[in-house]
Amino acid sequence: MPDDFYRFKSLRIFFASDNLFTTYPEVLGRCDALDIVGFKSNNIKVIPASALNLNLRWLILTGNKIEALPPSIGNCKRMQKLMLAGNQLASLPETLANCSNLSLLRIAANRITELPEWLLGLPNLAWLAFSGNHIKQDFTFADAQELNFEQFNLKELLGEGASGTIYKAERSNGEAITNVAIKIFKGNVTSDGYPDDEMNAYIAAGSHPVLVGLLGKVNFSKEKKRGLVMNLIPEDFFNLGAPPSLESCTRDIFNTGIGLSKLQVLKVANSMASVAQQLHARGIIHGDLYAHNILINENGDTLFGDFGAASFYNKNNAVVSFYLEKIEVKAYGYLLDDLLSICVEEENPSLVELARLRDLCLLPQHAERPGFDEIVEKLTALSD
């Protein structure tokens, strides 16, 4: 980059994805107004200590060759969102503990051997993905039924995400034809991690009324791609929220016309607490507990999915288990905050109690946040 690039004094957002940078440009450290920087899918190996300006709030370095972060990253006190998946990091600098505003961290698909307590104890960390590292796991992966790809006839595209594309498909068993959904994985590392880890987490999550039902897995041998076969989501379901914007950074955004009743809010809150309780009982942190991954209908019935950021953890490690559950509880607290913000009913005792629960979930001290067992208990009492 030009040595005088710093002359762009008002530049706030800079993306340079899919290029051939091998060193993070030092001159960017002199662009004082930079708020968001993205160097996804380059060949960056080195980040000079002076290259990270103090104003950074969102830094994307997914899919590079970075072996170490400079300790100077701890000076980025505004940092809220840090995307580091798909690099060669063996550890993180302890100075990152100074980034107390960090809310979302993606470190999947690296070479990290442990999650240090100073990292897990960050007061605002709510969304964490760390699968595909060298962390010791005492976990036997569940498996799903292998289905014959010849049973399926792919129809229209339903959606596309970082890890794969979802199609509507017809499934024929010789007698009847049923409609299903198939997610075909792209096979590359994403901003959240490896597709294999997503598949394993979805399978291990098990059956739950809120999870989109998993029917099995399928191999498309000709294309050398794999997929998961799921129940087709009924047409009356819609996305509760939309992913964060450049401005909102870590918080979902909502259509101006959306408004939920008290009943809908309580049903979604109950449903999400229940499924999170099951996941953590199985040693799984979802890592992306957001309204944009939730589908609801007019009755408040809820469906949840997208395990792209999910990670397994050792339930026998009491310290790690404690922190990872309380980190996800923080994310759940933000979800409650979102639900209350789009509720159209006037304040009543149930909503007041839900607001109190939100405040508990968002406390900076992990030990003072409730666990999901306690949250489910409180919500059950509210719904009675």
Language-model-detected regions and their locations in the chain:
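Activation segment signature within eukaryotic-like protein kinase domains
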Residues: 268-269
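C-lobe/activation-segment region of protein kinase-like
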Residues: 303, 308-360
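Short beta-strand micro-motifs within the conserved protein kinase catalytic domain, predominantly
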Residues: 213-226
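Conserved short submotifs of the Hanks-type protein kinase catalytic core
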Residues: 223-237
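Catalytic-loop of the protein kinase fold
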Residues: 276, 280-296
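ATP-binding glycine-rich loop module of kinase domains
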Residues: 164-203
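The feature encodes a structural signal of leucine-rich repeats
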Residues: 1-3, 24-26, 47-49, 69-72, ...
